Amino acid sequence: MFSKSVTLAQYDPDLAAAIAQEDQRQQDHVELIASENYVSCAVMEAQGSQLTNKYAEGYPGKRYYGGCEYVDIVEQLAIDRVKKLFGAQYANVQPHSGSQANQAVYASVLKPGDTILGMSLAHGGHLTHGASVNISGKLYNAVTYGLDENEVLDYAEVERLALEHKPKMIVAGASAYALQIDWAKFREIADKVGAYLFVDMAHYAGLVAGGEYPNPVPFCDFVTTTTHKTLRGPRGGVILCRDNTHEKALNSSIFPSLQGGPLMHVIAAKAVAFKEALQPEFKQYAKQVKINAAAMAEELVKRGLRIVSGRTESHVFLVDLQPMKITGKAAEAALGKAHITVNKNAIPNDPEKPFVTSGIRIGSAAMTTRGFNEADARVLANLVADVLSNPEDEANLAKVREQVTALCNKYPVYGA
């Protein structure tokens, strides 16, 4: 029998120490990785609950195991809340990740060898949108579109390629594109060639939920998202549809095709996050995320850096480091020493290798969760520029680190 009085620190001090160190790192560092965020204590409580003990293959009311009457309630809460949040008629909350949600969408209506048209990874797309190293690029005939000479999504190219290749599915969405995407234009192009339209809104879902980014659900046959990133929930995925046309095919694609038992403790945490995103204060959060990102981009331009696409209309933007004569890899390392966490990222037509890159990606979701306002964002942008202007000067890095520490102490991740 397990005792509730035995703590992790008592039973496994080595693991507890590593978790404590990560907790301290999150407190002491400013998180600017666009795909990361902080979850609430309620989300963590749900994810750490005894729901992890329960197997529940199938769907609410249609399980292959007994004893599912209470986890059915949990899953139905998550389904109902996410449908309300995004105005969807169908929702599947079981995908373990965004990648698996995407796989399920493909498998529901495509056959191996069918043509898909998605955004190039090199121009800001995602691995799962047909990259050659991903299963999506191996199973399907992937054709890619990108940005025009102004680094704006090239809708004319999308239409030209669609007319030329007649894809069975067009994929929209990105992992490193700062501007708003025109879902209606994609719908128009898809209809011209009789293609399914699938949007992966993983990066923008929180902004969509908060009314600060266009909702793709009314325009699309399929929508997926992760539940972390800007949505501020546990790590996982969701599939949404505007109607129930593909319900049976999608449900079968997740179970039994791609997954077995759902992670009920994670689904519970998703339900909590969806409830949080339905609250009025989440709209203010989403608004502040955009304000902070725009403020940072403006300050970095003033300091001589170039923003890919010229500006941001979301939570994320890419910084071209070539004017500073520093690589993304070197910038990531230098900023890390100053307790500012970013990720190196390729920019369009990047001359550097993918593990080196000429850019970094910056996102404002996590810092905004901590409470950073526009003035703080501008201060932080200048600290980033201070590091990039002199990345090898240890005294400079120490000075910036001291200022970052003061900011972090002002805005603890988890208060009392």
Swiss-Prot record:
Pfam families: SHMT. One of its GO terms (molecular function) is pyridoxal phosphate binding. Gene3D superfamilies: Aspartate Aminotransferase, domain 1 (3.90.1150.10), Type I PLP-dependent aspartate aminotransferase-like (Major domain) (3.40.640.10). InterPro entries: PyrdxlP-dep_Trfase, PyrdxlP-dep_Trfase_major, PyrdxlP-dep_Trfase_small, Ser_HO-MeTrfase, Ser_HO-MeTrfase-like, Ser_HO-MeTrfase_PLP_BS, SHMT-like_dom. The modification N6-(pyridoxal phosphate)lysine is found at K229. Its EC number is 2.1.2.1. Its cofactor is pyridoxal 5'-phosphate. It catalyses: (6R)-5,10-methylene-5,6,7,8-tetrahydrofolate + glycine + H2O = (6S)-5,6,7,8-tetrahydrofolate + L-serine. Keywords: Amino-acid biosynthesis, Cytoplasm, One-carbon metabolism, Pyridoxal phosphate, Transferase. Its main location: cytoplasm. The record marks H228 as: Plays an important role in substrate specificity. One of its GO terms (biological process) is glycine biosynthetic process from serine. Signal peptide: none annotated. Pathway: One-carbon metabolism; tetrahydrofolate interconversion; Amino-acid biosynthesis; glycine biosynthesis; glycine from L-serine: step 1/1. SUPFAM superfamilies: PLP-dependent transferases. It is found in: Cytoplasm. HAMAP family: SHMT (MF_00051). Catalyzes the reversible interconversion of serine and glycine with tetrahydrofolate (THF) serving as the one-carbon carrier. This reaction serves as the major source of one-carbon groups required for the biosynthesis of purines, thymidylate, methionine, and other important biomolecules. Also exhibits THF-independent aldolase activity toward beta-hydroxyamino acids, producing glycine and aldehydes, via a retro-aldol mechanism. Belongs to the SHMT family. This is Serine hydroxymethyltransferase. The gene is glyA.
